[in-house]
């Protein structure tokens, strides 16, 4: 009888360890999933303000300082970017990669695409913070950035949305500094595979408009992503990336 109990206990622990990966956006305190979350940190602030899908009526104070390692939305959402989990994989891009001296890039884009290898679960984090997050080295918010204003957006998505995101990112040529997403997960995503391999679009079109939706079955949010390459004749010779995001109470252009 006792042996049977321990067998059940072992199985229970294994199930929890297997399925507890974080590959979705999180609520204000990082204690539950959210379809989307946005943090705006004004210059000189530590916590910033947050609005998220579960409490979209108004902005609230952040649950913790962004430098805290836990108990706030983005610390939890990035839990398996800064730490290991066998079923959570990601691609990270940043024009100022962690631990790399100042380098010149063609893009200012910063973000992370996270997915689960054992479920149709993913998230896209877009932000403005240089040197953040550092892959697999623990949560480490760059405290020097508290003096500056920053925006962080997290969208919970299905894996099928990743290819459209990649199609837009291809044009702006982000600097990818980490990718451990297995090709078996992206076999049907030609744009993502080109992005991961560092391929550059040299043929028109040089502008892109992609549309994705968040995962919520009850109230999904539509997101339009506009991008333009340096080869585009429809503007100055620079890379640009614009994301329009709205819900009933929120509108952002990033």
Question: Where do the model's predicted regions map?
Answer:
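Charged, low-complexity intrinsically disordered terminal segments
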Residues: 2-254
């Amino acid at each position: 009888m006792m042996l049977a109990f321990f067998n059940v206990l072992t199985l229970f622990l294994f199930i929890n360890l297997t399925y507890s990966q974080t590959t979705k956006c999180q609520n204000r305190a990082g204690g539950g999933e959210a379809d989307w979350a946005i943090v705006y940190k004004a210059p000189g602030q530590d916590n910033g303000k947050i609005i998220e899908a579960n409490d979209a009526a108004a902005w609230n104070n952040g649950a913790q300082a962004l430098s805290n390692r836990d108990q706030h939305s983005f610390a939890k959402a990035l839990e398996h970017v800064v730490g290991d989990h066998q079923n959570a994989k990601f691609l990270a891009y940043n024009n100022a990669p962690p631990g790399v001296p100042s380098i010149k890039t063609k893009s200012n884009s910063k973000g992370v695409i996270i997915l689960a290898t054992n479920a149709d679960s993913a998230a896209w984090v877009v932000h403005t913070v240089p040197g953040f997050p550092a892959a697999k080295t623990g949560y480490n918010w760059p405290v020097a950035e508290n003096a500056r204003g920053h925006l962080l957006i997290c969208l919970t998505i299905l894996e099928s949305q990743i290819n459209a995101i990649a199609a837009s990112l291809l044009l702006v040529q982000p600097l990818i500094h980490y990718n451990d997403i297995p090709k078996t997960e992206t076999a049907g995503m030609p744009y993502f595979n080109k992005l991961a391999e560092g391929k550059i679009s040299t043929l028109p079109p040089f502008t892109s408009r992609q549309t994705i939706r968040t995962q919520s079955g009850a109230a999904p949010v539509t997101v339009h992503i506009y991008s333009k390459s340096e080869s585009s004749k429809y503007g100055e010779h620079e890379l640009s990336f614009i994301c329009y995001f709205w819900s009933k109470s929120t509108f952002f252009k990033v």
